């Protein structure tokens, strides 16, 4: 049973979040995978390396024979059982290897012998990857409106609430600043790009999309970088700037970086370890900008952070964090953002408070 797919078929797979049983080795999967893929490899990393060496030294027939020798008996049966269970759990899914070659065909034939007929991606991960790249290039050509504003302006929430918005920071699992990490590890660059492409395809498919609403991001979001085709279009885009009162920004930052992050860490690790992780998270964020703050100012703010953490631990109040957060915003983040915005002042087409910008975007 062999499936042939056109470019539109590949896009449909991504739009539908079709479950993909990816039979490549874990090392390949970690380097790049599709969003709805699960990794159930035909060969583990060591087995794949051994077969690859054999192929180079003795040719394809010897490599194939070695592969069958390595994945035999109980190991083979365990893997068939895992694939069979995944197929039954995901009846609308599809098999995938690197290029739609021997590995996915072997798994498909073994499943057929076990009573399961399951399609495969002709062209494999490589074809899906090329589809993702091409889709991003094409979709990035649509007009873009960027949401700008100082830290704590609620830009991400505003983007999330737009039907034509794509939350780049959410996809990157990072909020873009020194304090931007989340509890989820960031994806590999290729996996991030694949996820972004799938999200853009789904957003475009849900509506007659005329323009994108994105947050005004730099090239890097944590360890991930935006695809060059999208980044180039963003440098030409119109910008709507959120200008909320300082006190409202502080409330948002308190909720996002202190209350929510403390909750998330304790939920993930338990009270004691979660508290330690939360403290390390805040100190790591401050330490990341030590050079720009200067050693003396950094030491002062770090001491105020320690005091605030002690107060939070003993009383539950996060108010003490204002002692270091306010000067950090006024002396570092706000001047830095204003400097960046000045360089693209001609792109700014609207300014207003959060609700005003949201209404303006909605009317586009």
Swiss-Prot record:
It catalyses: 5-methylaminomethyl-2-thiouridine(34) in tRNA + selenophosphate + (2E)-geranyl diphosphate + H2O + H(+) = 5-methylaminomethyl-2-selenouridine(34) in tRNA + (2E)-thiogeraniol + phosphate + diphosphate; 5-methylaminomethyl-2-thiouridine(34) in tRNA + (2E)-geranyl diphosphate = 5-methylaminomethyl-S-(2E)-geranyl-thiouridine(34) in tRNA + diphosphate; 5-methylaminomethyl-S-(2E)-geranyl-thiouridine(34) in tRNA + selenophosphate + H(+) = 5-methylaminomethyl-2-(Se-phospho)selenouridine(34) in tRNA + (2E)-thiogeraniol; 5-methylaminomethyl-2-(Se-phospho)selenouridine(34) in tRNA + H2O = 5-methylaminomethyl-2-selenouridine(34) in tRNA + phosphate. GO terms for biological process: tRNA wobble uridine modification. Monomer. This is tRNA 2-selenouridine synthase. The active site is at 97 (s-selanylcysteine intermediate). The gene is selU. Pfam families: Rhodanese. It comes from Shigella boydii serotype 18 (strain CDC 3083-94 / BS512). CDD domains: RHOD_YbbB (cd01520). PANTHER family: TRNA 2-SELENOURIDINE SYNTHASE.
């Amino acid at each position: 049973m062999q499936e042939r797919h056109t470019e539109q078929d590949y896009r449909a797979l991504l739009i539908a979040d079709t479950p993909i049983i990816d039979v490549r080795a874990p090392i390949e999967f970690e380097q790049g995978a599709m969003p709805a893929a699960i990794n159930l490899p035909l060969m583990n990393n060591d087995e794949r390396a051994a077969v690859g060496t054999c192929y180079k030294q003795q040719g394809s027939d010897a490599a194939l024979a070695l592969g069958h020798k390595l994945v035999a008996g109980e190991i083979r049966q365990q893997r068939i059982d895992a694939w069979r269970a995944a197929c039954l759990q995901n009846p609308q899914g599809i098999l995938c290897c690197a290029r739609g070659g021997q590995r996915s065909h072997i798994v498909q034939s073994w499943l057929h012998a076990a009573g399961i007929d399951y399609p495969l991606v002709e062209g494999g991960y490589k074809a899906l990857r090329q589809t993702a790249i091409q889709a991003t290039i094409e979709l990035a050509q649509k007009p873009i409106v960027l949401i700008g504003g100082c830290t704590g302006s609620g830009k991400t929430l505003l983007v999330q609430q737009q039907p034509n918005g794509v939350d780049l920071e959410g996809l990157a699992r990072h909020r873009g600043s020194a304090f931007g990490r989340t509890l989820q590890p960031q994806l590999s660059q290729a996996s991030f790009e694949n996820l972004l492409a799938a999200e853009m395809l789904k957003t475009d498919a849900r509506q007659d999309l005329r323009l994108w609403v994105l947050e005004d991001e730099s090239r890097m979001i944590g360890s991930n970088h935006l695809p060059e085709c999208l980044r180039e279009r963003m440098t030409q885009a119109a910008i709507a700037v959120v200008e909320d009162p300082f006190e409202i920004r502080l409330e948002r930052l308190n909720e996002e970086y202190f209350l929510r992050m403390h909750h998330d860490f304790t939920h993930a690790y338990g009270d004691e370890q979660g508290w330690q992780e939360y403290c390390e998270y805040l100190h790591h964020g401050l330490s990341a900008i030590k050079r720009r703050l200067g050693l003396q100012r950094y030491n002062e703010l770090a001491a105020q952070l320690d005091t605030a953490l002690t107060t939070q631990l003993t009383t539950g109040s996060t108010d003490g964090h204002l002692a270091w957060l306010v000067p950090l915003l006024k002396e570092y983040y706000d001047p830095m953002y204003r400097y960046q915005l000045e360089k693209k002042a001609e792109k700014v087409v609207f300014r207003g408070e959060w609700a005003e910008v949201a209404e303006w975007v909605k009317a586009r």
